[in-house]
Amino acid sequence: MDKKVAIVTGGSSGIGKEIAKHLYRNGMEVYALSRRVDEMNDLDDLGIKTKFIDVADYDSVESTISDIVDEAGRIDVLVNNAGFGAFGSVEQVDIREGEYQFKVNVFGVMKLIQTVLPTMRAQKSGRIINISSIDGKVASLMGSWYVGSKFAIEGISDALRLELKQFGIDVVVVEPGAIKSNWRSIAMSKLKQSSGDGPYAKSARKISDFFEVAYKYSSKPMVVARAVDQAALSKRPKTRYAVGSGAHTLLCLRRILPDKAFDAFMDGLMDCAQKILNKEKAQRNQIDPEPEVK
């Protein structure tokens, strides 16, 4: 029996790389895709096939997927993992930066789905796994652009699940919480560039401090990869998998608390994070007393 074929975007680092390794170890023929092909040499060494893709370039998407279909003859699993977070106030983030955020996180995902669907429909089977975030259900301060893109993925996935059921194609969403990856450094760098000064500087510091503390308790990318394994390999996958530090707690509280009560809860969490950092800073800056002279 031929191996099932899986495609993983954003395969050059963190979560995507771990997903590719796990699917490969579970017996799939895996194609890891990224703009940074030189950072996937370790995947090549394992036997995972790597290819260039720029999900924001629709011609690149069509060309790469066409090459894979020509080589493998089928596509069983598409994992839409490529994406990034650009934090900053709506007012201060350049609209072109916001558009690019949506082009990568939403329209790139949609183009990939469009491109693999003819093959999956012909097979009368397939599985589309969209890596969203708890930010697709829980809004973060200064994260309107990123949060908006992830809320979009949640809704798109629900509608797509209804569309594709008739063809035997499953649609699954994975919602990571706090995960150790380079996502935070990129998101906070964008935040500092756009809103580090000016009227939103206080809010920028607040959310930056919160993410710094949350990162200390974040989960390894492996937990996301395991969820993708379940989504890809189960006969009857769940429609959603929430994984990682804080995911279940925050999603549960978001469901049961009224909007303003949840806002107050999140504000309290961020205040608590700032107190923790201030205490740590004070301890680091504390001058040891001189030894007593006897």
Which functions belong to the PLM regions below?
Residues 166-215:
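C-terminal beta-strand-loop-alpha-helix "lid" module of Rossmann-like NAD(P)-dependent dehydrogenases
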Residues 53-63, 95:
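The beta1-alpha1 cofactor-binding region of Rossmann-like NAD(H)/NADP(H)-dependent oxidoreductases
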Residues 12-13:
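Conserved glycine-rich cofactor-binding loop
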